[in-house]
Amino acid sequence: MQKLTIRRPDDWHLHLRDGAMLEGVIGDTSRHFARAIIMPNLVPPVVTTADATAYRERILKALPAGDRFQPLMTLYLTEHTNPDDVEEGKKSGLITAVKLYPAGATTNSHGGVRNLDKAMPTLERMAKIGLPLCVHGEVTTPEVDIFDREAVFIETVLDPLRQRLPELKVTMEHVTTSDGIDYIKSAKANLAGSITTHHLIINRNAILVGGIRPHYYCLPVAKRESHRLALRAAATSGDSRFFLGTDSAPHVDPLKECACGCAGIYTSINTMSCLAHVFEQDGALDKLEAFASLNGPAWYGLAPNEERITLIRRVESVTFPEKIETGAGTVTVFDPMFPLHWDVEG
């Protein structure tokens, strides 16, 4: 029986939601992950340090008994964000990053930034105090094809911002294109990228071939196969600029299976099994720890976890529930469309 022991991983991009959904999904993360950067796009969003403090308390209260898990809180950037509040949040140790959502780019992003100039006082303060900016890297202008949103964002928004504020530390979250990978590789400093589990596995065919498959629909949307292969190469390379951010995003089935379904894929429960499969398939099991457990902490200035987990490769396939039940409703679990043989021990 093959075994692989690695430092306990972290998730550098996670949606826990709130209320009954939070209570229903948090255990799938805290079972395997020590820390996670928590997305602030609630309704209403987490825009102040006081909001983040209250949300963190709700997360900790929802943790299953005995689980050790540290939520790393973020603030939702608006055109009215108070730079002093952001700085206080960082000084207190509460705030790990600030999240930029272009208005309308994804779930609950309508209160996001429309004019980046109006957010510059906060961004300048962040650059000064060394607080990272996490970006949803897509433009939302209607004339841009949805499959080109990331590349156009890099050219028209991100690169001008980084030239204007070269000392600002930026995380390109959920990179989905070779353009994004190449841009990160070309940067001399202050740029890194998170990659999701599902974007390593699916391309856009998964959503569209054989019928509309809403449980593979996410934002940024999965791209063509050449982009998926570029993501795989980056993730399995050991390059310290790339790390795991699952973007696990639960929605109840009625909100996915409808005429205008929500974007989001729920992967927290089986991410480590999926990743072990991917890295084994690419002959890179020795790089899994860097991607899931080492590169992220190094980027965010944190120590790696001392605790270890062990992955076991089983002869028989490992089964996960097709759906989970939460107090908010039924959530469909990501199906990688191949059998999984790696399991987390215990």
Curated annotation (Swiss-Prot):
InterPro entries per UniProt: Amidohydro-rel, DHOdimr, Dihydroorotase_CS, Metal_Hydrolase
Reaction equation(s) it catalyzes: (S)-dihydroorotate + H2O = N-carbamoyl-L-aspartate + H(+)
Positions of the catalytic residues: D247
Cofactor(s) needed by this chain: Zn(2+)
Tagged with keyword Heme: no
Protein task: Catalyzes the reversible cyclization of carbamoyl aspartate to dihydroorotate.
Family named by the database record: Belongs to the metallo-dependent hydrolases superfamily. DHOase family. Class II DHOase subfamily.
Name this polypeptide is given: Dihydroorotase
Source species: Rhizobium rhizogenes (strain K84 / ATCC BAA-868)
